[in-house]
């Protein structure tokens, strides 16, 4: 008998085969499950502390999602050649896993829980995040840790009018929707989505479809737990001290009710702090044995009860609004004189200063993802310093919350951005939250859209975002439009919806209770649409459409197309040609594999110079066309004439003049500018020229230098020539011609040119 007690559960999920295993790997953890979906393999482990840290007053859940580069057969590209700090994708996936799991731990459970998920193998067409959600749910369910799960999860696409289960990256390219939903058997817990302006009905249908498909995974997890689950912890919620609760309520109720009559956030916060301090002082004076953490927890419950009961009773909200009213909005565009685009968006006590910057293709962010590298030409970064909430705090590295809010705002705007062909710029938006009292991420959506329009980005439509809240008690509920920070803190849901007049572009839902129903989501989406239309009207009044020209401080981009076979000519040996061209013009020049060239310059004249130079470098020599160029080299049997940058032709000795030429140097000298006509080119691209066809045949006894180009006197100065690219000497021009060949008449001028090659 082996040392492992391995249990395996296999089930079919749409077109995919899912295998869940436990009992072989990570046996020291409280729970460990290995999930395989068509060669994507994820290991989820969970460990929980058996004791609570002194003074702990919140649930300390930590989720770490880690991608190993060996999963895709790669070695890390860093100096140390090992995985370092989490990537943005890893951080976002950690949040994606955390959000549906956190509400399922019981109230009062403050033991530390650490969930670690490793991606061990990756099939590029099977996303690891869904496998990670299922593995995490299964690991918690069989660990014995107090947990009201399991949950199921699914990704939903919308392709050609049909919902698709777990579409891979390739399929999603043709999908109008990328939605991830997670929930229990009874209700939805989390939604994260990006959409191409879809209706509320389609979005709600996608959530319901995904929730139903997730139940397949829940059933399989139940079977795995039945076969391999560990004993459930003997944990009970701390006993309620009814006498203390009554005493605290008697001391605090009137004070907190009075505080919540104050409309201003800062004044209200100070009043609540004063109430807390007064109650704690009175308890101490009365000799009541109660630690501060416990007393503050009771005070928070009283706060929540006051706010929630008032809203459910139909009374005005904290700031005096009803459930459907959006706070006053003020918009000012172009607030920063030298920024490429900017907008100050203020909604009540929430304010975002959004700044847009335009760059070239070289400014795009290079993403070294596990599934492969790619360039991202649109970035949105969200920053919220402590002063935005009137607090003192440390400024350090970007926090998970800031990364998540930035990605949500980015998702909302992607659907209306112009294509690279329509607008070849790289775009970056930075949302600086200067005030925050609820829904700062949605303020970033509004401000970000306006700043891009101010920068001259041809957006397809305006995009606005709104955050919806929920107060639920039994069968009674109230959906709140444009929630405040306190309503988010004391309520049951944060449901963010962004979109245009045509439909939804992004949706995110976070739940604090164990699920919401279809009815609640339907009401929330309807109210969100009403609020979105109101905000869009305000935005359109501020900026009706994008500026037709980019800022004078932004680089101007000019595109041109060349034959892909000519790319090497523009680049030159070792990059010499393009480097010299860049230094000469001061422009940035980017060349794509298909021959598309983008020239970036702040000076249009310099861009024109660069464009003309590239046209000269890539131009084809045409048969029958007349060129003017310098003599680059004298040969015994003729001369090399530069026709175009890097392109020479052979002027044979017999084609210099009508009379017999004994020595080329009697007629030509290096550097002399001559006019020649292209007569022919052979299969190897060698070009033959003629001077004499451009000159009239001289009358008997006339000057022998009647060739259309006066021969310079030996040693005379010649006009200075513009710097040119290094010449390439033509080879295999043949042997000196015979006397009969020298006397042969040239071919007649055909007039119109014919391109060589």
From Swiss-Prot:
Mg(2+) binds at residues 488, 494. InterPro entries: ExoRNase_PH_dom1, ExoRNase_PH_dom2, ExoRNase_PH_dom2_sf, KH_dom, KH_dom_type_1, KH_dom_type_1_sf, NA-bd_OB-fold, PNPase. Residues 737-747 have a biased composition (Low complexity). The keyword DNA damage does not apply. Its cofactor is Mg(2+). It is found in: Cytoplasm. Residues 555-614 form the KH domain. PROSITE patterns: KH_TYPE_1 (PS50084), S1 (PS50126). Gene3D superfamilies: GHMP Kinase, N-terminal domain, K Homology domain, type 1, Nucleic acid-binding proteins. It comes from the Bacteria. Pfam families: KH_1, PNPase, RNase_PH, RNase_PH_C, S1. One of its GO terms (cellular component) is cytosol. Residues 720-736 have a biased composition (Basic and acidic residues). Keywords: Cytoplasm, Magnesium, Metal-binding, Nucleotidyltransferase, RNA-binding, Transferase. Residues 624-692 form the S1 motif domain. Involved in mRNA degradation. Catalyzes the phosphorolysis of single-stranded polyribonucleotides processively in the 3'- to 5'-direction. This is Polyribonucleotide nucleotidyltransferase. It comes from Verminephrobacter eiseniae (strain EF01-2).
């Amino acid at each position: 008998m082996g040392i492992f007690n391995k249990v395996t559960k296999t089930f079919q999920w749409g077109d995919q085969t899912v295998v869940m295993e436990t009992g072989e790997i990570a046996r020291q953890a409280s729970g460990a499950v290995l999930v395989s979906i068509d060669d994507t393999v994820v290991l989820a482990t969970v460990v929980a502390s058996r004791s609570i840290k002194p003074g702990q007053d919140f649930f300390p859940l930590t989720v770490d999602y880690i991608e190993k580069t060996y999963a895709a057969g790669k070695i890390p590209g860093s100096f140390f050649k090992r995985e370092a700090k989490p990537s943005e994708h890893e951080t976002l996936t950690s949040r994606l896993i955390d959000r549906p799991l956190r509400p399922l731990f019981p109230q009062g459970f403050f033991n530390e829980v650490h969930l670690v998920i490793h991606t061990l193998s990756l099939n590029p067409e099977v996303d690891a995040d869904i496998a990670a959600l299922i593995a995490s749910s299964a690991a918690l369910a069989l660990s014995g840790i107090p947990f009201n799960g399991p949950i199921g999860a699914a990704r939903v696409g919308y392709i050609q009018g049909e919902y698709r289960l777990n579409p891979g990256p390739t399929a999603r390219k043709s999908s109008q929707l990328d939605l991830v939903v997670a929930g229990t058997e009874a209700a939805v817990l989390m939604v994260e989505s990006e959409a191409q302006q879809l209706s509320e009905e389609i979005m709600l249908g996608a959530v319901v479809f995904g929730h139903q498909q997730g139940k397949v995974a829940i059933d399989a997890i139940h079977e795995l737990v039945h076969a391999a689950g560990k004993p459930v912890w003997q944990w009970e919620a701390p006993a309620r001290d009814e006498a203390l609760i009554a005493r605290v309520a008697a001391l605090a109720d009137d004070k907190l009710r009075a505080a919540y009559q104050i409309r201003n956030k800062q004044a209200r916060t100070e009043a609540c702090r004063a109430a807390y301090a007064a109650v704690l002082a009175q308890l101490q004076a009365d000799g009541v044995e109660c630690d501060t953490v416990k007393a503050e927890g009771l005070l928070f419950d009283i706060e929540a009860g006051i706010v929630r009961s008032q809203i459910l009773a139909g009374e005005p909200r904290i700031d005096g609004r009803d459930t459907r009213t959006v706070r006053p909005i003020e918009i000012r565009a172009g607030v920063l004189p030298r920024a490429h685009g900017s907008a100050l968006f203020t909604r009540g006590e929430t304010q975002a200063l959004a700044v847009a910057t335009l760059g070239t293709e070289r400014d795009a962010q290079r993403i070294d993802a596990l599934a492969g590298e790619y360039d991202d030409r649109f970035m949105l970064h969200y920053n919220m310093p402590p002063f935005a909430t009137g607090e003192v705090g440390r400024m350090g590295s970007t926090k998970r919350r800031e990364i998540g809010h930035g990605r949500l705002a980015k998702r909302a705007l992607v659907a209306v951005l112009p294509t690279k062909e329509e607008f070849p710029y790289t775009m970056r938006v930075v949302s600086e939250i200067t005030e925050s009292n609820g829904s700062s991420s949605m303020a970033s959506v509004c401000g970000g859209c306006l700043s891009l329009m101010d920068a001259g980005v041809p957006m397809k439509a305006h995009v606005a975002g709104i955050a919806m809240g929920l107060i639920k008690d039994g069968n009674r509920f109230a959906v709140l439009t444009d929630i405040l920070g306190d309503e988010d803190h004391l309520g049951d849901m944060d449901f963010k919806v962004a979109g245009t007049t045509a439909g939804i572009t992004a949706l995110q839902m976070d739940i604090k209770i164990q699920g919401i129903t279809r009815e609640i989501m339907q009401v929330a989406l309807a109210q969100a649409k009403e609020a979105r239309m109101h905000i869009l009207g305000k935005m359109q009044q501020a900026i009706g459409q994008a500026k037709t020209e980019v800022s004078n401080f932004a680089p101007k981009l000019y595109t041109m197309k060349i034959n892909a076979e000519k790319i090497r000519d523009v680049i030159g040996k070792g990059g010499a040609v393009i480097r010299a061209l860049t230094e000469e013009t001061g422009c940035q020049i980017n060349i794509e594999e298909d021959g598309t060239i983008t020239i970036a310059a702040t000076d249009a004249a310099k861009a024109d110079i660069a464009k003309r130079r590239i046209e000269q470098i890539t131009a084809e020599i045409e048969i029958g066309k007349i060129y003017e160029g310098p003599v680059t080299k004298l040969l015994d049997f003729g001369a090399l004439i530069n026709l175009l940058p890097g392109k020479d032709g052979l002027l044979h000795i017999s084609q210099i003049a009508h009379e017999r030429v004994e020595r080329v140097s009697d007629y030509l000298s290096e550097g002399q500018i001559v006019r020649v006509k292209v007569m022919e080119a052979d299969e190897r691209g060698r070009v033959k020229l003629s001077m004499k066809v451009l000159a009239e045949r001289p009358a008997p006894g006339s000057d022998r230098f009647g060739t259309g180009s006066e021969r310079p006197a030996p040693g005379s100065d010649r006009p200075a020539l513009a710097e040119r690219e290094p010449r390439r000497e033509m080879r295999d021009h043949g042997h000196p011609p015979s006397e009969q060949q020298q006397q042969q008449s040239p071919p007649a001028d055909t007039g119109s040119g014919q391109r060589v090659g």
